[in-house]
Structure formats: structure tokens, C-alpha cells
């Protein structure tokens, strides 16, 4: 089957790039191909962090566990331990594998938005309720907590940023979380949309920077843009595009704040779910949207080594072949993507394709 066979090139990519890695002053960001979902492994010289643990189906579920297993086989110095696991929001495509990761590997710290609802509520509740007994430090964070007292610098602490590598220490900051009260201008529907309560995390490694916003949608995006527009809080070289490249998660005002050099989209193959009855698929959602690609195209200055022709959507179940020239990557096109970042702000991108 196609989904199973993709495990082989992903692992070959992992092993080939591993040959050049050691205890050096570099970080690696693994955008793991989990189909219509998201999971990103941050690898540092002295530790590892996982942001989200989604998977589209059982084959991708097993694939994520296999990928992490091979990672820890290579990084024996980490003793099968994730210094931190972050779940941006309680949807199953972002935490499907959370329970099995907790059973298979050691997790030192776990953070989320504190919600106990949504399609991924079982796994989120499990982690929240079992953390203390498993000796996992757990915290949840809200937008109000982060911005209290007019704070526009985000928040960080030893839970959010547990990595302390000699001469290669990242700075990890949280800029948004769940909204405790309905913001002005939000409808009740906006407030009940758990995507809008996604954690927003920025990782700065010397002169390199990465931004992760979960599935934050238009109202949530506008709230953080309004909050931080007078700062460089959201400015980042590498943007993980929100909500799998949906039309409602990337705006002009937002990209003006981020000014990305590279964009990465995590989504499934365009025809995943075509002909089936399951509506929670790439085909039914129509990810990524062509208008999102076009908007990114306006802001990203550099080009991929080679342009690619790939499928993107005008709407649900309406895909078309487009040419992608700019530094826009997607797990649907490139499968697992690994970005090597240096303290001096140099990036090297490796993909399965």
C-alpha cells in the first residue's frame, strides 16, 4: 500500500541526514509526514521536543512511532526521552498518537491549552490526569495569562523551554493559548472553535527562528496580530503554515508580521479520502488551498531548488495542478521534511522527494 511504502523513504532520509549529525551547534526540525495531521520533532544537541502527535490513520500512527523509535536509536544519549511534548489544541489530528508515545517513550514535560473537549479530548484528558502519577510536569496556558499586565514578550519558563545546551541554547517562547473569555469581535462560534485556542510557539536558535501556530484560524490570528503588531514577536524565518494550509489560517496582515523565508505545510495526499465516506480527510477538506499558496508566494522571497507541480485545492474536493516555485514545502508533496538550522541563521532543507 502507498501509505506503508512511504515509511521506507522517510527512514532512508532520516538515516542519510543522520550521518552528518552529531553533538554540534545545529538544530534539526523534522516535519514528519503523518498524512492529514501534524507532528514536528525539534532536535537539539542535548534534547528533543515534540510539537503535536497527530496521524491520519493507523499506518501513519505506526509510522510516527517508528520514526521516533529510529530517532532514539540514533540519539542514544537522550535515553528515549522527550524533554517536552506540546499539543497545540485538542483535535485528534494533532494528538492521535499521544497515548502511545507516552507509553513507549519517556516524557519529562507536557503542555497544552487546558481544554478538555474536542475530537482529541480523550488523549488530552489522559495526559492532564496522568501527568503527576507519571512524573511528568504539566502546565496549561491561556492568552490572558501570557499577556497579563500588558506583556508583549510572550512567556517562557523551565517547562516551556527545558533545553539548555552548552553553546547551543534555544529560546522557546509561548505567545498565545486558550482564550478564557470571548474576545471582542468574536462570535460565539469563533469562541467555541477549538482551533482558535491553539498554542502559538516560537523557537529561536541563534539567528534561526521557527513559528508554530497549530490550527489557529482567522479570529485567533487577528487577535495575536493585534496584540503583537508593535513588536517582532511573530517574526520568524520558517513558518509552519496553520491549519494544514486551509484558507482560514493565513492572512495578509499575519504574513506581514511573520515575514517568512520558508513555509512548511503538514497535510495529507490530495486524494486521501476520495471515493470514501469519511469527511475528515484531505480530499473533503481541500488542503492546502490555492489562495493560501498564492498568498505565501507573495511574501516568500526565495525559490525551491527546483519548482514542482503539485495538487492544491480551490475548495473542498476541488483540486488542481499548480506550479510551486517559492520556498513552500508540504508533507503532501515532499513527505517528511527536515530543516537543519545553524546558530548563524543558515538553513538546509532535505525532503523525501
What are the roles of these predicted feature ranges?
Residues 97-101, 125-126, 223-227, 250-258:
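A short acidic, amphipathic alpha-helical/loop segment
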Residues 109, 115-180, 185-186, 191-193, ...:
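Binuclear metal-ion centers of metallo-dependent hydrolases, dominated by the metallo-beta-lactamase
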Residues 2-10:
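Sec-dependent signal peptide recognition
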Residues 20-26, 306, 310:
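Sec-dependent signal peptide cleavage junction
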Residues 22-80, 143-235, 332-353:
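Core dinuclear metal-dependent hydrolase active-site scaffold
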Amino acid at each position: 500500500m502507498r501509505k506503508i511504502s512511504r515509511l521506507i523513504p522517510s527512514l532512508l532520509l532520516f538515516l542519510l541526514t543522520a550521518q552528518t549529525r552529531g553533538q554540534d551547534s545545529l538544530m534539526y526540525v523534522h516535519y514528519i509526514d503523518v498524512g492529514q495531521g501534524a507532528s514536528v520533532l525539534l532536535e537539539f544537541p542535548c534534547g528533543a521536543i515534540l510539537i503535536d502527535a497527530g496521524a491520519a490513520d493507523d499506518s501513519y500512527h505506526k509510522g510516527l512511532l517508528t520514526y521516533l523509535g529510529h530517532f532514539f536509536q540514533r540519539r542514544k544519549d537522550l535515553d528515549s526521552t522527550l524533554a517536552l511534548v506540546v499539543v497545540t489544541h485538542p483535535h485528534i489530528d494533532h494528538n492521535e498518537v499521544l497515548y502511545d508515545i507516552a507509553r513507549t517513550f519517556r516524557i519529562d514535560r507536557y503542555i497544552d491549552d487546558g481544554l478538555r473537549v474536542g475530537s482529541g479530548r480523550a488523549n488530552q484528558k489522559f495526559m492532564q490526569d496522568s501527568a503527576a502519577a507519571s512524573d511528568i510536569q504539566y502546565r496549561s496556558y491561556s492568552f490572558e495569562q501570557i499577556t497579563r499586565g500588558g506583556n508583549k514578550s510572550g512567556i517562557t519558563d523551565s517547562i516551556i523551554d527545558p533545553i539548555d545546551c552548552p553553546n547551543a541554547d534555544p529560546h522557546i517562547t509561548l505567545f498565545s493559548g486558550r482564550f478564557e473569555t470571548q474576545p471582542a469581535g468574536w462570535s460565539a462560534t469563533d469562541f467555541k472553535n477549538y482551533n482558535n485556542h491553539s498554542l502559538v510557539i516560537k523557537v529561536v536558535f541563534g539567528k534561526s527562528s521557527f513559528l508554530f501556530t497549530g490550527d489557529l484560524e482567522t479570529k485567533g490570528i487577528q487577535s495575536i496580530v493585534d496584540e503583537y503588531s508593535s513588536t517582532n514577536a511573530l517574526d520568524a524565518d520558517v513558518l509552519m503554515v496553520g491549519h494544514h494550509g486551509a484558507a482560514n489560517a493565513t492572512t495578509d496582515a499575519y504574513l506581514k508580521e511573520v515575514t517568512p523565508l520558508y513555509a512548511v505545510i503538514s497535510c495529507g495526499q490530495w486524494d486521501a479520502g476520495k471515493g470514501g465516506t469519511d469527511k475528515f480527510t484531505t480530499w473533503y477538506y481541500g488542503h492546502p488551498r490555492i489562495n493560501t499558496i498564492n498568498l505565501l508566494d507573495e511574501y516568500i522571497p526565495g525559490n525551491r531548488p527546483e519548482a514542482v507541480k503539485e495538487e492544491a485545492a480551490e475548495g473542498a474536493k476541488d483540486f488542481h495542478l499548480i506550479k510551486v516555485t517559492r520556498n513552500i514545502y508540504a508533507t503532501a508533496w515532499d513527505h517528511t521534511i527536515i530543516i537543519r538550522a545553524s546558530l548563524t541563521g543558515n538553513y538546509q532543507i532535505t525532503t523525501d522527494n
